[in-house]
Structures are given as structure tokens and as C-alpha cells.
């Protein structure tokens, strides 16, 4: 078993390789040339170079990684398989949402993560920026990261306020820069959160993924936000991934 990361400097891939005891394959200048008997963990790459593409078993095919990396494509292809927030690419729909008193999340970057390229607009007369994707804002009761491998949840963490953050927390966009982190021992995800996460990974054709799921504070419904195919891994999460991958080979 080998691992190839979209980012040569990925700390998560490095931590996982060390925990399993496998080699990371370099992007260039590698003497490794994988063949039919080899298994490759594809850590977030939508394209594989020739020296790894020949592996007999590739966990997370690059085409599946590409299909979830683009948020608009993800909503278009898999929105019927799991519950996602209401979305549109039509500014007429956005205007209706605003006129109804709702807020709208403008997504300027389709392949971003951690809140990159997000802008929230509200009010009936507000200008609507041109963007490739808009989602209806849903107030959060909680947000979870559910790690799924081969249809099974191997770990879960909840997003909480970072106790070491000294700035003003951003409750609308709960990312690291806004003062939030994922932590364990902060409750248990509901059955609906788990169900939506597993359904999203299975529908996408991925072997594994870290699914970000939010819970509506009004009715408790779980909504899939995105699937991470190269999540950051530390501590217990590294151990659980290593154990799960170790059971595959």
C-alpha cells in the first residue's frame, strides 16, 4: 500500500503514512512505478501521474475526487442522494429568497474550503453579486465532521469555539479564522447526521471522505455541506484512519 497526495507537503498524508507504515509517492523524480498488485490511497488528487495511475486498486478514484471538489457539480450530481442546503445558480431565485426575508450565502469559489470565497448577503434591496453558486442560509445548531470509509463511520468531531481564539468569533461562517475548531468529546452526532454523511460518500463513488454536516437549529435536519478527500489528520483521527486502512490490505 502507498499514498499519493495532491499536496506534496500535506501533513495529514504524512501523519497517515507514518501511522500505517507505508511510503508516500513523490510527484516527480520517484522511482516507484505502481502496478496491478499495488494499492494506492489517493489523498485528494483529481489527477494521478502515470507512475501511480497503474495501481491495481486506487482508494478514491481521481474522477470521484473531482466530482466532489467542485461544489456546484456536487450539488447537481448528488443533491438527490443526500440532503443539501437549498442552492441555485440563478440570481432570480436569490432575489426571491431575499424578498422572503432570508439570507443568502454567495459562493465565489467553487473549489474552496474552510469558508474561502464566502459572502453573506441579506435584505430586500441588496445588490446580488455575480457568482457561480448561491445557497440559502440555514441557521446552525451544530456542525460535524463525519469520517466515512467503505460505508462505515470511523470517526466524528464537532465544531466548537476555539478556547484559545481571542478575536470576534464569526458565527455565520464557522471556520478556523473565525474562531472555530473541530473537537472530539463534544457530543454524539444524530442518526440523521450519520445517515446523510454515509449517503453522500456512497453516492459520490468515493471509498472514503470527511463529510461536513450541519444541523438546522429550527428542526434538527442534517444538511451535507461538502466532502473533504484530503482532510487534516491529527491525534486520534490519524489512529482511526490507520486502523481502517490497515484492515483493507
What are these regions (language model features)?
Residues 104, 152-155, 209, 223-225:
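Protein kinase-like catalytic core scaffold
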Residues 105-192:
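Phosphate-binding site of ATP-dependent enzymes
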Residues 188, 202-208, 215-249:
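C-terminal active-site "lid" helix and adjoining low-complexity regulatory extension at the edge
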Residues 148-150, 213-217:
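Short, low-complexity Ser/Thr-rich regulatory SLiMs
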Residues 192-202:
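A short, acidic, amphipathic alpha-helical segment used as a generic capping/interface helix at domain edges
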Residues 2-100:
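Conserved N-proximal alpha/beta basic substrate-recognition cap immediately N-terminal to
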Residues 45-47, 109-111, 230:
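Short glycine-rich anion-binding loops that position phosphate/pyrophosphate groups of nucleotides
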Residues 6, 41-44, 107-109, 135-137, ...:
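Short His-Asn-centered micro-motif
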